[in-house]
Amino acid sequence: MRSDLLPASGTYADIPIGEVLTEAGASIPETSLRLYAFYDAAEQAAVPTPPEERPIVLIEHALTGDGNAADWWADMVGVGKPIDTAKYLVLCANALGGCAGSTGPSSLHPEGGFWGSRFPGLSIRDLVQAEKQLLDVLEIPRVHVIIGASMGGARTLEWSLLYPEMMDAILPIAVSARASAWQIGIQSAQIRVIEADPLWHGGDYYEAGMGPVWGLGEARRIAHLTYRGELEVDERFGAEPQQGENPLGKFRSPDQRFSVEGYLDRQAMKLRNRFDAGSYVTLTDALNRHDLGRDRGGMNAALGNSTVPTMVCGIDTDILYPYHQQEHLSRNLGTFLGLSQITSPTGHDGFLIEARQMGNVLEKFLVTAEKLAKDPEQRANILQQHHH
């Protein structure tokens, strides 16, 4: 491992990974990924265990996430937390195509100007390929486990099929074997709204200094409803008016809102302030292209051929990736460790909200993964059970 390239614990480094060739045949030259690393000292220890002596946990973030996993998954990642940064070397990189430090549409193009509309379409496999190149640069031949939820879960599954020899076990959370027609439909509706913003300019708005933030906010309103639970949203807001407003007047007026509209307005504003529309379109399109079965004989064959021990986790009220999709993974995975259900009214976002349940699942998974790493025979046995 090139410890000299690792950022100090809790910080990031931008690591050049060279050219990335996409699954569809496009080239992204001079690419770099922003990598966060966490390897703290234990509370009693005077000095931390050096990172090169630790098992590696690779975390994959969701659509609008970034590499700072100790921030967006604060209950899970840290000293003494389920993913213990005093025990593991925890790595998390901003995805290719993102806008939190890695090369994406808002990055400068090597030939001048911004990438913008010149940035190619990406698949989930392309995001994994870029991360593989990152690990190659760091001279990390394998990791202990890979854990990811939502888009991160899609990358986790692709990692296990593209480079099965590089990990002991994986935990994909709240994801499916491929994008469903419903997901593609609602996600492409979000893309259309951004493209309909007059400031989109075909993706080339970076020079203008003003971007399609209206469209991005509207896309987030749609998306956010798919991240929550239907009953939870109704319980919180019902058909109540926004405080001091009247949505039942003589004429409909955009400043006379229902309470839930005010909530979605706040969610839209939060994302507008921290995310780029070009990255939103690129990564949402990558989710539309998610299909483990492509060029592998279909998704059930692809799952059946998986040789990486896999624990699956889902949320009972998930609208975006319904629990039956995790059950489907479980039935078909070649090397299956178990299926855990998080019970929550909050839907897809449950993996971020239900800290106690999520922590239990992670701890159970990491104990199992450690046993597998120590006892290769056990892994062989699991494989045998499934491939008889």
Swiss-Prot record:
One term under GO cellular component? cytoplasm
Reactions catalysed: L-homoserine + acetyl-CoA = O-acetyl-L-homoserine + CoA
A GO MF annotation of the entry reads: homoserine O-acetyltransferase activity
Task: Extract the InterPro entries matched here.
Answer: AB_hydrolase_1 (IPR000073), AB_hydrolase_fold (IPR029058), HAT_MetX-like (IPR008220)
List keywords of the entry alphabetically: Acyltransferase, Amino-acid biosynthesis, Cytoplasm, Methionine biosynthesis, Transferase
The protein's location, in the record's own words, is: Cytoplasm
Q: Where are the transmembrane segments?
A: none
Q: What is its EC number?
A: 2.3.1.31
Q: Where does substrate bind?
A: R220, D349
Pathway, according to UniProt?
Answer: Amino-acid biosynthesis; L-methionine biosynthesis via de novo pathway; O-acetyl-L-homoserine from L-homoserine: step 1/1
**Family of this protein:** Belongs to the AB hydrolase superfamily. MetX family.
Q: How does it assemble?
A: Homodimer.
Q: What is this protein called?
A: Homoserine O-acetyltransferase
According to its UniProt entry, this protein's organism is Corynebacterium urealyticum (strain ATCC 43042 / DSM 7109)
